[in-house]
């Protein structure tokens, strides 16, 4: 393409009068890459966007000392179906199980829960990333789901938007996000810091449901552990016509450049669905950790629940691990040992059974129930296809148990030798050989007679004992 043609095309893209607009999918994903007269920070779109925003999105302006913000408020009725569940049921579960939040996060999270999700100008985070749409949601007393979405109408409106968002955050007993500890919270805190405003996020207990969701339900082989994948799997919800995440920044840049809010309508709907799915997923998690092991549907859920309890010091961890073993055994009897690939192996019933046995043995040992722990270690040693590292750990634990607690040196020697067979490498092998040498010394001592007879002293009652016999 010759320079003249390229120059004309670029002028068409950035024409402030709206000529030569391009499709949103062809827009660059970063405003810094747009040539021409992109709106600079502090340049307000003013009345050019006001009527369009209110007409397309149906929101309102809120003015504060720091500036004003455009807010779109929606109410989703409790009887509205979302996937297999009604919205009001999410609120009821959260209300009944809110104490379970303390098992998933530190800082004493409590209700009311504020569900929080950002749409940003980039996916990399950092100081140059702006949160142009801040979604906040909660359940009201009637079980309806309320959403407030705050739009940064241009870069100069960010300070006003942040001041209004802070009012929502100040009312929260806990902040609930999906990957928010790694992305949403750092992004919004950076923007508060940039404007020299106090960040309310740092003062609120934060429940990030991504990490427990990974433990409980794993990753879909195609969709991974995204919110969309989990809402399909757990809530039965499917989105129709949803805007792809990679396209969202480009739609915002088009709005800033042209003042046309129509491309943002789908972005707002995408954000609302994210908030609703986040609420449904949180309700499912809290109900699970509150009701206990009996409510788990499969061995993976039970194992993850045991780890949540163990991390929180909850005594129900033992029952959860027992439940995981029970469900894994049932799945193995049904022929559920197949796996998609090696990385996925520990998610199979066989892999979960091994992990649950190991976790249970460690839990019992910490409770000083050494005999019960030894039973679980022995089950691991005898289990076919047990990973080498876990088998080695189990044989070593059994050698220690029989040497120091059962005082069965022969059994201790046997398990030490088994441990050496599993892992003879230098670091491990040296420790095992040291243990074997000690056991051998103890065995030699135990084989000596307690009161050995002296050759110079005949035994009592012999003819040469010095006593005459009567004739």
Question: Predicted segment positions?
Answer:
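Residue at a conserved register position within TPR or TPR-like alpha-solenoid repeats
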Residues: 309, 364, 402-403, 440
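N-terminal accessory regions of nucleic-acid-interacting proteins
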Residues: 1-110, 305
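Acidic, Mg2+-coordinating catalytic module of metal-dependent nucleases/exonucleases
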Residues: 222, 226-296
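Conserved DEDDh/DEDDy metal-dependent 3′-5′ exonuclease domain
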Residues: 142-234
